Amino acid sequence: MTSRDAARQAMQERILETTDRLFYGQGIRAVGVDTIAAEIGISKRTLYNYFPSKEALIVAYLSRRAVPRTVSDRPPLEQILGVFDWLDRWFASKAFRGCPFVNAVAEIGERSHPATKIAVNQKERRRVAFRDILTGFGVADPDGLATQLTILVEGAMAAALVRDDPAMARAAKSAARVLLTAAGVTADDDKSTVRKPNSLRRASKSPRQSEKPGPAPRRRRS
C-alpha cells in the first residue's frame, strides 16, 4: 500500500467514524453531509470524493455496523445467553440510543432502500446464529425457538430505550432461560447439553447431545 492509499484509507475511516457517531447519536435525518464535513474539518467536496452522496454514507454506516458473526469456542448455551449479557452492558452505556438498524428503517421509511435491506439481513443473521446453535442441541424446532429468542433481543432493545433501564436485558435473559429449558436445553458442568422430552427421545440415542461450537456476538454492533 502506498502512502497515498494509506492516507485515503485513514480519511475514509475518519469519515465513517464521525458519521457513525452523528447518525447514531442524533439521527440520520437530522444530520446533513455539511455537518459531518464540518465536524471532520473538511469541505463537502472532499467528503464527496469518498462518498458520492448521503445515501452512500447511510449504506456505509449500516454496513460498518453489520459485523459478520465469528466462530467461538465458548459453550453454545453461553453464546446464546451471552448475547443478553452484552445487551446489559450496552444498555448501561451513556451512548445507547436503541438499535441503529431499527432507527434507520424508521427514519428512512422505504422498504426498497438499500439500508433497509442491510437492516433486515443483520436481524436475520442473528436469528440464524441462534438457529445454528439450537440445531446443534437437537431441539425439536430450532427455527421457531431462534425466532422467539430474536424477538426477546429486539424487545429488550426497544424496552431499554423507552424505559432507560438496562435491567430489560436481564429480564429478557430470564425469559430466554425459560424458553430454552422448555425446549430441553440445560447447562451441566459448564457444558451445554440438551435433554429431550420423553416423547422426543429415541431409544437408540442418548438424550445428551454433543457440544458444538457456534457464533459469538460482537460487542460493539447491534
Q: Which sequence ranges carry the predicted segments?
A:
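Basic, helix-initiating cap at the start of DNA-binding domains
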Residues: 1-26, 30-42, 56
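C-terminal peripheral helix-coil segments that are non-catalytic and often amphipathic
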Residues: 1-2, 89, 124-140, 159-222
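Amphipathic, non-transmembrane alpha-helical scaffold segments
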Residues: 8, 12, 16, 62, ...
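Short hydrophobic/aromatic patch on the recognition helix
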Residues: 40-51
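Alpha-helical DNA-contacting segments of helix-turn-helix folds
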Residues: 51, 56-65, 72
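Hydrophobic alpha-helical connector segments
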Residues: 60, 70-97, 146-149
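Amphipathic alpha-helical packing segments from all-alpha helical-bundle domains
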Residues: 69-81, 111-137, 144-147, 174
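Amphipathic alpha-helical segments used for helix-helix packing
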Residues: 93-117
